[in-house]
Swiss-Prot record:
<feature type="disulfide bond">
    <location>
        <begin position="93"/>
        <end position="133"/>
    </location>
</feature>
<keyword id="KW-0020">Allergen</keyword>
<protein>
    <recommendedName>
        <fullName>Putative invertase inhibitor</fullName>
    </recommendedName>
</protein>
<feature type="signal peptide">
    <location>
        <begin position="1"/>
        <end position="14"/>
    </location>
</feature>
<dbReference type="GO" id="GO:0004857">
    <property type="term" value="F:enzyme inhibitor activity"/>
</dbReference>
<dbReference type="InterPro" id="IPR035513">
    <property type="entry name" value="Invertase/methylesterase_inhib"/>
</dbReference>
<comment type="similarity">
    <text>Belongs to the PMEI family.</text>
</comment>
<dbReference type="Pfam" id="PF04043">
    <property type="entry name" value="PMEI"/>
</dbReference>
<feature type="disulfide bond">
    <location>
        <begin position="22"/>
        <end position="37"/>
    </location>
</feature>
<keyword id="KW-1015">Disulfide bond</keyword>
<dbReference type="InterPro" id="IPR006501">
    <property type="entry name" value="Pectinesterase_inhib_dom"/>
</dbReference>
<dbReference type="InterPro" id="IPR034088">
    <property type="entry name" value="Pla_a_1-like"/>
</dbReference>
<keyword id="KW-0732">Signal</keyword>
């Protein structure tokens, strides 16, 4: 009986860190939806035992996964016959997401070494890369981004990490 009660308390406290963090993040960042944050962080089993620093690493890893999905999705589009202008913007996005991945990997190392100011700079760079990808499609009339929804999810994931760096004192 005592063990099951202790486990219930542990899971309630764990859920509270995700929900509490997401509440603070959503209040501070216009790029983050509370429900998206809770769903994203809560989907990782490690979030249930993580501290704030750990949630920063988890959200950064989720951003890497989302960036990889976007690159794969773009690769499939590029294998089909596409307008040359669209192809140019998609290729630009592939390069931008490669840069973003490097930035996020460095930010993860910074989180782990508690260099939150550096993690903040690198997560900002990754967020900027995804915005630049999306903005590229607006340069030519009649070209619509096929990755808008995916980019929005990526922006939220990087914004979560970015906001966590600020909560940690960056």
């Amino acid at each position: 009986m005592k063990l099951s009660f202790s486990l219930c308390i542990f899971f309630l406290i764990s859920a509270d860190i995700v929900q509490g963090t997401c509440k603070k993040v959503a209040q501070r960042s216009p790029n983050v939806n509370y429900d998206f944050c809770v769903k994203s962080l809560g989907a990782d089993p490690k979030s249930h035992s993580a501290d704030l620093q750990g949630l920063g690493v988890i959200s950064a890893n989720l951003a890497i996964q989302q960036g990889s999905k976007i690159q794969t999705f773009i690769g499939r589009i590029l294998k089909s016959k596409v307008d040359p202008a669209l192809k140019k913007y998609l290729n630009d996005c592939v390069g931008l997401y490669a840069d973003a991945k490097s930035s996020v990997q460095e930010a993860i190392a910074d989180f782990k070494s508690k260099d939150y100011a550096s993690a903040n700079v690198k997560m900002s760079a990754a967020l900027d890369d995804s915005v630049t990808c999306e903005d590229g499609f607006k340069e030519k009339k009649g070209i619509a981004s096929p990755v808008t929804k995916e980019n929005k999810d990526y922006v939220q994931l990087t914004a979560i990490s970015l906001a966590i760096t600020k909560l940690l004192g960056a």
